[in-house]
């Protein structure tokens, strides 16, 4: 069963339709995905338009929608001002803030008027993530994960979208965020590796030291996971059992690791795209981890299927 089918079942069995807002109603791709989500009946997908003219002809009126130019935004501006005035925000800035669709969506999430947000088809990542960070808060360090799926195989690649050059401490949190997320997906067995160009001391250098340190920090915090976590490993050692038996004979895992923690954004972003384009894996994500509330950022190249899938994932993230 695919991860999306699994999550559909999980959301439906919860007995409550999560409300996931899509603040880019002027995007035809987003609107097609929203229509499909509405028809599927798994979640409630309200949308935001900036102007009445953006509402498409034949719009499905069963879908709740917000038109910013027609709204009284006073309540939302007051909320943002109270939330951000300690950072120097003035009321006029708060009023401008909530006239932006992405920022208004984050405000609605923060006020519990909706359960989560999916944005990024029309916005750059920095413009979707900034209001979410300002209003939703973080559990620790914000990172992301891609679910890489091919046939019955499911892998988790992190961080391929946000953490540019994480410190050892930050890399340990990236790993923690992803391990917890993979657990929430109901995986029967998790094997996580911290990737490097070195396998257990075969290489030297500052980059290796960082990965070794991150592994140690993670295991000091989670000693109960020692049998599930290893670092530093090269990718072939982590993925191919025959290679691992040669390079790391004391590591007794069977099969491949299924969580791959990349040392920096260069490696992670390149790695997931190679797996996607050359390896034939479907890349689902990036899924944002570490925020206090469910929020996910789309690629601007996202297809209707991508938007639909991220909507389902975000709905699943609302479940406790």
Curated annotation (Swiss-Prot):
Catalysed conversion reaction: acetyl-CoA + phosphate = acetyl phosphate + CoA
Any GO BP: acetyl-CoA biosynthetic process
EC number(s) from the headed UniProt entry: 2.3.1.8
This protein's record includes keyword DNA repair: no
Enzyme type, top EC level: transferase
UniProt keyword NAD, yes or no: no
Annotated Gene Ontology cellular component terms: cytoplasm
PANTHER family with a match to the protein in the record: PHOSPHATE ACETYLTRANSFERASE
Name listed for the protein in its UniProt record: Phosphate acetyltransferase
Organism: Mycoplasma pneumoniae (strain ATCC 29342 / M129 / Subtype 1) (Mycoplasmoides pneumoniae)
